[in-house]
Design a protein with these regions (language model features):
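NAD(P)-cofactor binding segment of oxidoreductase domains
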Residues: 1-26
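Mid/C-terminal beta-alpha module of Rossmann-like enzyme folds, strongest
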Residues: 119, 126-174
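Glycine-rich Rossmann NAD(P)(H)-binding loop
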Residues: 102-107, 133-141, 192
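Active-site Tyr-X1-5-Lys
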Residues: 48-72
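Active-site "gating" loop of Rossmann-like NAD(P)-dependent oxidoreductase/epimerase domains
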Residues: 31-51
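NAD(P)-dependent short-chain dehydrogenase/reductase
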Residues: 63-108, 113-117, 121
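C-terminal amphipathic/interface module of NAD(P)-dependent oxidoreductases
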Residues: 178-205
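SDR active-site strand-loop-helix element
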Residues: 25-30, 35, 74-76
């Protein structure tokens, strides 16, 4: 219920306020609106097919946000910023020389919060066509294990300390929400407006 209140009902209220006051609504969404059953990066035109409650509530929020005449729905993935996140967790483990088990069969691209902010500012200042835009870090698609290895390498630790495992093995016996196996989002649409995201490996360095 909380997920729907925050991710669906909240955007609906904001969309009404934006419409009534002729404001531009920026709504952040997620790769979790997709099911991961793809062999290429997702485009903005691909149909949504969420696997869990969070993804379903975010998909509903997208629909609600688009009722505002002036809107930018920004889908992103694997966000890295202040506070707790995957990269920060891996850095902590690397600094303690811990050998973590990390899933290798969930793939995507990290997005640094600073780059996300730059992309949103670009949309608001250049005002391209309203709609949905994908905004993630540029660069190669990686599994969480490969991202962890990049973190270990950056801290001068042996990347082989990271132990790749399947999601099935990692979550064996643990309660967890289903996640898309492929989370890679195509950024061609926002790039066509003049914003080219930074390679995530540059941001990680």
């Amino acid at each position: 219920a909380r997920a729907w209140a925050v991710n669906a009902h909240g955007p609906a209220r904001l969309a009404r306020i934006a419409a009534e006051n002729n404001l531009t609504l920026v709504h952040l969404s997620t790769d979790y609106v997709f099911d991961g059953d793809t062999d290429r990066p997702y485009t903005e035109d691909d149909p949504v097919a969420p696997l869990n409650v969070y993804g379903a509530s975010k998909a509903a929020g997208e629909v609600a946000a688009q009722t505002a005449p002036r809107h930018y729905v920004v889908r992103t993935s694997w966000v890295v910023g202040e506070g707790r996140n995957f990269v920060d967790t891996m850095r902590g483990l690397a600094e303690r020389d811990i050998r973590p088990q990390v899933v290798h069969d969930q793939k995507g691209r990290p997005t640094f919060a600073s780059e996300l902010a730059k992309g949103i500012r670009h949309l608001l200042t250049t005002q391209p066509e309203y709609g949905i835009y994908h905004l993630t870090g540029a660069g190669d698609e990686v599994g969480f294990d490969e991202l962890a290895m990049a973190v270990y390498t950056g801290l001068h630790r042996d990347p082989d300390m990271v132990q790749p495992v399947t999601s099935e093995r990692y979550f064996d016996g643990k309660a967890h929400a289903r996640r898309p196996s492929i989370s890679t989002l195509s950024t061609a649409k926002i790039e066509a407006t003049g914003f080219v995201p930074q390679n995530w490996r540059v941001g990680l360095a």
